[in-house]
From Swiss-Prot:
Gene designation per UniProt: atpC
Protein name per its UniProtKB record: ATP synthase epsilon chain
Membrane topology annotation: Peripheral membrane protein
Keywords assigned by UniProt, alphabetized: ATP synthesis, Cell inner membrane, Cell membrane, CF(1), Hydrogen ion transport, Ion transport, Membrane, Transport
Keyword Membrane belongs to the record: yes
Any one GO molecular-function label of the UniProt entry: ATP binding
Lineage of producing organism: Bacteria, Pseudomonadati, Pseudomonadota, Alphaproteobacteria, Rhodobacterales
UniProt similarity note: Belongs to the ATPase epsilon chain family.
Length: 138
């Protein structure tokens, strides 16, 4: 199939997905993007969000919390800090991720009191993490 690309989703713990897909919706740090066959070469960082693949075998959804994606004309590789199939995410999992983001914000405020950049980044991470829960209806 000329309309498919090789897709790989890897987290530090395991390979979550590998196969041919027609499209991948990626929660990029600069906004959501859809990558398909013949996409221009791109590397983007991920924000917490829902990564969705579409392919011959149907649609798959994964919650990711960060990392990066490398996109070429023939492949899409996502290296995620944390990735969990959406169907496996529990409220307790999400609550733990939000708590971790809240703690990171507190630490950023303490360490960078007069530097808004790192504090803003941590606040955005927390907001994105909360939005993930709203998006997947936990």
């Amino acid at each position: 199939m000329a309309d498919t690309v090789q897709f790989d989703l890897v987290s530090p713990e395991r390979l979550l997905a590998s196969g041919q897909v027609t499209a991948v919706q990626i929660p990029g740090a600069d906004g959501d993007m859809t990558a398909m066959a013949e996409h221009a070469p791109t590397i983007t960082t991920l924000r917490p969000g829902l990564l969705v693949t579409e392919g011959p075998d149907g649609t798959s959804e994964y919650v990711v919390t960060g990392g990066f994606a490398e996109i070429t004309a023939s492949s899409i590789s996502v290296l995620a800090e944390r990735a969990i199939p959406k169907a496996e995410v529990t409220k307790a999992d999400h609550d733990a991720m939000v708590k971790e983001a809240e703690e990171a914000l507190v630490k950023a405020k303490e360490a960078f009191a007069n530097e808004p950049g790192p504090v803003d980044d941590a606040a955005k991470m927390l907001a994105d993490m909360v939005a993930v829960g709203d998006h997947i209806t936990l």
